[in-house]
């Protein structure tokens, strides 16, 4: 009986692990290949952390904090292995960049996600934008002022809902 229980436990564990395989693609540029600004080429990159064997998943675009003066992209541990993708974005920082450069970078990154997430298995109608501190500010500006997203050809006909709304 112990052997059967042990084998059954091992089988269930292996199946559970097989369902939770994640991949991270790092340092993907979200700016045009013809970009000539070296600082922009250096900073405007993103990492995509996504479930490899799952389709039609949601995606969170995550902007790091740092007061627009510091910080680097990272995948928060709280968002890992939750069944959705996380796109961590770097953007230009002050003093090398001035407002609204970081907002424009954020908009271009989100537009890139809208245009490309289906290639990774995600749904482009299930993209959420969030961040910490300065990253939260960038998320809010993109939600409130659609001109930034429109400048990069992203469909700005989306609804902003709070958690719990249908």
Which residue stretches match the model-derived regions?
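Primarily recognizes the serine-hydrolase "nucleophile elbow" in alpha/beta-hydrolase
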Residues: 115-166
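Short beta-strand element of the alpha/beta-hydrolase
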Residues: 56-65
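Short amphipathic alpha-helix adjacent to the substrate-entry channel of hydrolases
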Residues: 72-89
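Catalytic nucleophile-loop/oxyanion-hole region of alpha/beta-hydrolase
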Residues: 35, 72, 89-124
């Amino acid at each position: 009986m112990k052997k059967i229980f042990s084998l059954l436990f091992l089988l269930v564990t292996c199946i559970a692990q097989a369902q939770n395989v994640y991949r991270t693609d790092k340092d993907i540029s979200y700016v045009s290949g013809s970009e000539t600004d070296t600082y922009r080429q250096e900073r405007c990159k993103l990492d995509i952390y996504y479930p490899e064997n799952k389709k039609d998943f949601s995606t969170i675009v995550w902007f790091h904090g740092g007061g627009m003066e510091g910080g680097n992209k990272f995948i928060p541990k709280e968002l890992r292995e939750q069944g959705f993708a996380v796109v961590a974005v770097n953007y230009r920082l002050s003093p090398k960049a001035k407002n609204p450069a970081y907002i424009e970078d954020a908009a271009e990154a989100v537009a890139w996600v809208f245009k490309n997430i289906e290639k990774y298995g995600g749904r482009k109608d299930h993209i959420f934008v969030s961040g910490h501190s300065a990253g939260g500010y960038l998320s809010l500006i993109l939600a409130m002022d659609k001109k930034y997203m429109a400048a990069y050809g992203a469909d700005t006909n989306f609804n902003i809902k709070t958690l719990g709304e249908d």
